[in-house]
Amino acid sequence: MTVTTERIARIIESKEIMTLLPHRYPFLLVDRVTDYEEGKWLTAIKNVSVNEPCFTGHFPDQPILPGVLILEALAQAMGILAFKTHELSNKELFYFAGVDEARFKRPILPGDQMMLKVEVIRERRGITAFTGVASVNGEVACEAKLMCARR
């Protein structure tokens, strides 16, 4: 007889996200964490609304979520994972410290649900290196290697 145990997703709702990250509207770019494993990976979503402030200028007749905001959303997802992994004081923050090999493969548009996945590559002396992928409907929109620094 084989007993299988199904892993239950670890969800973090927006109210708890706001206790972990200092960001607020319009710069809080993670709506919900759909699952995570401390020190390893995290998946989350950002529902992209036509009412996002960036769309008034990027671009008025053809709104596209700016690539830097996609990268910031990935960094925020990593920040949530870091706060769930480490016991940190309220005064400590994770700063976006670097980005390498960023590739943008499709635009993210109003109405899209952006899926975020971050995975830790290594962590050393307060610096976390990780990979990030943002996708829509299973199609990769952006992928990059990023770094966050704990201060």
From Swiss-Prot:
Q: Which coarse location class applies to the principal site listed for this UniProt protein?
A: cytoplasm
- Biological-process GO terms, alphabetical: fatty acid biosynthetic process; lipid A biosynthetic process
Give the Enzyme Commission number.
4.2.1.59
Q: Where is the active site?
A: H58
Q: Kindly list the places in or outside the cell where this protein is found, as annotated in its UniProt entry.
A: Cytoplasm
Q: Which GO terms describe its cellular component?
A: cytoplasm; membrane
Q: Which domain of life is it from?
A: Bacteria
The top EC class, named as a word, is lyase
For molecular function, the Gene Ontology terms on record are:
(3R)-hydroxyacyl-[acyl-carrier-protein] dehydratase activity
Q: InterPro entries given for it?
A: FabA_FabZ (IPR013114), FabZ (IPR010084), HotDog_dom_sf (IPR029069)
Q: Which keywords are on file for this protein?
A: Cytoplasm, Lipid A biosynthesis, Lipid biosynthesis, Lipid metabolism, Lyase
What is the reaction catalyzed? a (3R)-hydroxyacyl-[ACP] = a (2E)-enoyl-[ACP] + H2O
Give the function comment from the record. Involved in unsaturated fatty acids biosynthesis. Catalyzes the dehydration of short chain beta-hydroxyacyl-ACPs and long chain saturated and unsaturated beta-hydroxyacyl-ACPs.
Q: Which family does it belong to?
A: Belongs to the thioester dehydratase family. FabZ subfamily.
Question: What is the name of the protein in this document?
Answer: 3-hydroxyacyl-[acyl-carrier-protein] dehydratase FabZ
Q: What is the lineage of its organism?
A: Bacteria, Pseudomonadati, Pseudomonadota, Gammaproteobacteria, Pasteurellales
